[in-house]
């Protein structure tokens, strides 16, 4: 069983982010919902037995442990969907933290022997690359994303140790064109 300390650390980090947004909104004379944002949070540590990964996910986008060698893609949560298309849940919504059962469902822990990449991305990346939430569970789609990143004809990203140019390569890659997808694009990759 995973220690309650991990839940405290990850859950408190998410809650502190929620509180910080509320405090900033108050200081600016704005409403917290003016700062509506998703949150994709993960911590990980390598041990002799493998990797420990814990996460907290509010909103849409994608948070996934991907392993090309074993052809697996493990979502570390479930994207939130609203009542209508294009709607989601946001970190700024107070009920995210008042319903303890729903809160703990947002926390995930995994131990894996190894992985190729830990991906965290907003829907500006996940929507055009995966098209549906069901496709987020398809390892073939994650293979396609990995191949697009690393073998892109126009803007390849060299995801190798000590590649200082990776950040600029990734920024160039994020500028891809996708009809009907004009949302913000943010991606973090641990590889």
Predicted regions and their residues:
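Catalytic core of PPM/PP2C metal-dependent serine/threonine phosphatase domains
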Residues: 1-65, 103-112, 173-175, 179, ...
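Residue-level preference for alpha-helix termini and adjacent loops
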Residues: 34, 38, 89-90, 124
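Generic "edge-of-domain/loop-turn" microfeature
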Residues: 46-49, 70, 127
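Short, surface-exposed, charged loop/turn segments at secondary-structure junctions
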Residues: 58, 69-83, 131-147
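Short, catalytically relevant binding-site loops at active-site mouths
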Residues: 62-64, 81-84, 126-127
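Conserved, helical-rich catalytic subdomain that frames metal- and/or nucleotide-binding sites
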Residues: 73-119
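C-terminal catalytic subdomain
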Residues: 100-191
């Amino acid at each position: 069983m995973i220690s309650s300390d991990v839940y405290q650390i990850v859950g408190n980090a998410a809650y502190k982010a929620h509180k910080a947004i509320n405090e900033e909104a108050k200081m600016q004379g704005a409403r917290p919902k003016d700062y509506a944002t998703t949150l994709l949070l993960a911590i990980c540590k390598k041990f002799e037995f493998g990797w420990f990964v814990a996460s907290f996910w509010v909103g849409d986008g994608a948070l996934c442990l991907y392993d090309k060698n074993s052809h697996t893609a493990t979502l570390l949560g479930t994207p939130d969907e609203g009542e209508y298309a294009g709607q989601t849940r946001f970190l700024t919504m107070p009920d995210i933290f008042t319903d303890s059962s729903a809160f703990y469902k947002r926390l995930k822990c995994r131990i894996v022997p190894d992985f190729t990449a830990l991906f965290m991305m907003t829907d500006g990346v996940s929507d055009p690359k995966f098209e549906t939430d069901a496709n987020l569970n398809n390892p073939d789609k994650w293979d396609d994303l990995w191949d697009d990143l690393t073998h892109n004809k126009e803007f390849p990203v060299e995801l190798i140790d000590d590649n200082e140019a990776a950040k600029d390569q990734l920024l160039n890659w994020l500028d891809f064109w996708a009809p009907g997808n004009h949302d913000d694009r943010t991606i973090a990759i641990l590889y």
